[in-house]
Design a protein with these regions (language model features):
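Glycoside hydrolase catalytic-domain context in secreted enzymes
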Residues: 1-179
Length: 179
């Protein structure tokens, strides 16, 4: 982040997005900027793969953490959003990814996981919120995480075979990635 001031963070983030993506008037994208880490935490601390930000109040979430992301999505038209690590994994958090990001803010571009974040759902001594890679991967895609930085999504075929996710749901993510 650029600091704890939501307005300053928003303005600096918008300048970076505009500088990277351009003004959007060209035939092709200049490059994709990525707003990260949505939302609340993905710091460099040693415990980021087991950290739990449950002490963040709804007021703090809405007044401190979300304003910069909202500005980057609605004003900056950022092309990618990276979901954060957290004990309740942000990469499978339907409130953050579907209700707020996609429905309330109208975001229809790419959501990417931070590296290893989907693995944290099931790796021993990490978050351990899901029993297997297939369950974790299916939940992440259903929740709106289109692209994974890691190897867990290789289990999506198994997830389809087990009925954890449909091919149509996977195709939604694939289409966003290929646009």
């Amino acid at each position: 982040t650029y600091g704890e001031d939501p307005y300053l963070t928003s303005q600096m983030g918008l300048a970076v997005v505009k500088g990277l993506q351009g003004d959007g008037t060209g035939k092709y994208d200049k490059t994709h900027a990525c707003a990260k880490h949505y939302a609340v935490h993905s710091g460099p601390e040693w415990n980021r793969h087991s950290f739990d930000s449950k002490n963040i109040s709804q007021r703090d979430l809405w007044e401190t953490y979300l304003p910069a992301f909202k500005a980057l999505v609605k004003e900056g038209k950022v092309k990618e959003v990276m979901c954060a690590y957290n004990r309740e994994p942000c990469c499978s958090n339907k409130q953050l990814l579907i209700r707020i990001l996609r429905e309330d803010w109208g975001y229809d571009d790419i959501v990417v996981s931070d590296c290893g974040a989907i693995g944290d759902f099931y790796y021993p001594n990490h978050h351990e919120t899901h029993p297997t890679a297939a369950a974790a991967s299916a939940d992440a895609v259903v929740s709106g995480t289109d692209l994974e930085c890691g190897g867990s999504y290789s289990s999506l075929n198994e997830a389809v075979q087990k009925g954890l996710i449909s091919e149509e749901k996977i195709n939604e993510s694939v289409f966003r990635l290929l646009r």
